């Protein structure tokens, strides 16, 4: 049987599929993904140290995510596709697979959210970027509105442009402390 796999997006994936483009079909279904706690608390090396959205269980607001269909029918291939786009190891891609009952995430809470979401959907699996906040580790400061703004103010040139574009382009309903 053919499996239908959802790719869940909440950050730059929505406006920059990059090398994932040939591996998905159709348009983004806006705000039809699971509701996740999101914050701009990931310092992204890929994006020149701009702040990027990450699933974050700190004091953050739940935000709706978006869905696009993978062309893959095998969860492992969908994981590798997303890992390649994110320039990260497959272990940093979360997944739930209804066919095998297997799943992976750094956080049990996230797996529960995805199992609940997929339960009454027409998908057999889902993959998502399962990064973890690293703001404290990379800046040495606790994440809050002030320290995040200070970090953004410290950026210049290309990193600053990247940061502005990312925060501006994030979906309108991603309503976080920083935004």
Predicted features and spans:
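A glycine-rich, hydrophobic/aromatic-adjacent loop/helix-cap motif
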Residues: 2-179
């Amino acid at each position: 049987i053919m499996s239908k796999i959802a790719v869940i997006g909440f950050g730059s994936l929505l406006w920059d599929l990059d090398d994932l483009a040939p591996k998905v079909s159709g348009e983004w279904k806006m705000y039809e993904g699971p509701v996740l706690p999101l914050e701009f608390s990931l310092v992204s090396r890929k994006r020149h140290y701009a702040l990027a959205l990450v699933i974050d269980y700190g004091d953050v607001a739940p935000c709706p995510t978006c869905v696009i269909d993978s062309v893959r029918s095998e969860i492992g291939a969908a994981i590798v596709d997303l890992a390649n786009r994110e320039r990260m190891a497959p272990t940093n891609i979360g997944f739930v697979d209804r066919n095998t009952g297997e799943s992976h995430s750094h956080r049990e809470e996230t797996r529960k959210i995805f199992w609940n979401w997929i339960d009454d959907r027409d998908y057999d699996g889902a993959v998502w970027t399962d990064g973890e906040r690293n703001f404290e580790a990379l800046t040495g400061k606790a994440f809050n509105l002030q320290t995040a703004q200070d970090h953004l103010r410290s950026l210049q040139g290309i990193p600053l442009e990247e940061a502005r574009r990312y925060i501006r382009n994030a979906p309108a309903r991603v309503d976080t402390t920083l935004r």
